[in-house]
């Protein structure tokens, strides 16, 4: 192949600019118009783990006192009317109820893990109570 002489040509400035896709153009235009910033969201499970650590550290009662007191009085009325309770008695009842519920949920969680699940279901609570001998 014979060599040819190269002549100088005027530069066109490289490649011609491509047309932007509609979605890219819309994305670039949105922030300049003062778009609303989306609120920050944690990954699923992060807040749950934080709450677990928080409640495991704490010792305060988690059930509100007045609703619990009303429930106790309502249940007690079935046995005898005009019963009176010392505030310390209601406090002791609430303390024991919360301790019972926490241990029940621990056993329920073990039942769910045994079934290769991470979500507890009502059948896990039933199994935990049956294994404890509370329910036949």
UniProtKB/Swiss-Prot annotation:
Phosphoserine modified-residue sites: 11
Domain of life of the native organism: Eukaryota
N6-methyllysine modifications at: 5, 10, 19, 24, 28, 37, 80
PROSITE patterns: HISTONE_H3_1, HISTONE_H3_2
Phosphoprotein among keywords: yes
Modified residues (N6-acetyllysine): 10, 15, 19, 24, 28, 37, 57, 65
Any Pfam family matching the protein: Histone
Location of this chain's protein in the cell: Nucleus; Chromosome
Modification type N6,N6,N6-trimethyllysine: residues: 5, 28, 37, 80
Region named Disordered: 1-43
Keyword annotations of the record: Acetylation, Chromosome, DNA-binding, Methylation, Nucleosome core, Nucleus, Phosphoprotein
PTM annotation (N6,N6-dimethyllysine): residues: 5, 15, 28, 37, 80
Transmembrane region(s): none
Main location: nucleus
PTM note: Phosphorylated to form H3S10ph. H3S10ph promotes subsequent H3K14ac formation and is required for transcriptional activation through TBP recruitment to the promoters. Mono-, di- and trimethylated by the COMPASS complex to form H3K4me1/2/3. H3K4me activates gene expression by regulating transcription elongation and plays a role in telomere length maintenance. H3K4me enrichment correlates with transcription levels, and occurs in a 5' to 3' gradient with H3K4me3 enrichment at the 5'-end of genes, shifting to H3K4me2 and then H3K4me1. Methylated by set2 to form H3K36me. H3K36me represses gene expression. Methylated by dot1 to form H3K79me. H3K79me is required for association of SIR proteins with telomeric regions and for telomeric silencing.
GO molecular function per UniProt: DNA binding; protein heterodimerization activity; structural constituent of chromatin
SMART domains assigned to the protein according to its UniProt record, in alphabetical order: H3
Protein's UniProt keywords contain Amino-acid biosynthesis: no
GO annotation terms (biological process): rRNA transcription
GO cellular component: nucleosome; nucleus
Residue numbers of Methylhistidine PTMs: 40
Family per similarity comment: Belongs to the histone H3 family.
Subunit structure, interactors included: The nucleosome is a histone octamer containing two molecules each of H2A, H2B, H3 and H4 assembled in one H3-H4 heterotetramer and two H2A-H2B heterodimers. The octamer wraps approximately 147 bp of DNA.
Function: Core component of nucleosome. Nucleosomes wrap and compact DNA into chromatin, limiting DNA accessibility to the cellular machineries which require DNA as a template. Histones thereby play a central role in transcription regulation, DNA repair, DNA replication and chromosomal stability. DNA accessibility is regulated via a complex set of post-translational modifications of histones, also called histone code, and nucleosome remodeling.
This protein's name: Histone H3
């Amino acid at each position: 192949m014979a060599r040819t002489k190269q002549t100088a040509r005027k530069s066109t400035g490289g490649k011609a600019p491509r047309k932007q896709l509609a979605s890219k153009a819309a994305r670039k235009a949105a922030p300049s118009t003062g778009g609303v910033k989306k609120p920050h969201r944690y990954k699923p499970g992060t807040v749950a783990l934080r709450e677990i650590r928080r409640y495991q550290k704490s010792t305060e009662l988690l059930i509100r006192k007045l609703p619990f007191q009303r429930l106790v009085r309502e249940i007690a009325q079935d046995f005898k009317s005009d019963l009176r309770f010392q505030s310390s008695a209601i406090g002791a009842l609430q303390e024991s109820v919360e301790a019972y519920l926490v241990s029940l949920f621990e056993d329920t969680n073990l039942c769910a893990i045994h079934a290769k699940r991470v979500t507890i279901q009502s059948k896990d609570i039933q199994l935990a109570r049956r294994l404890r001998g509370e329910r036949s």
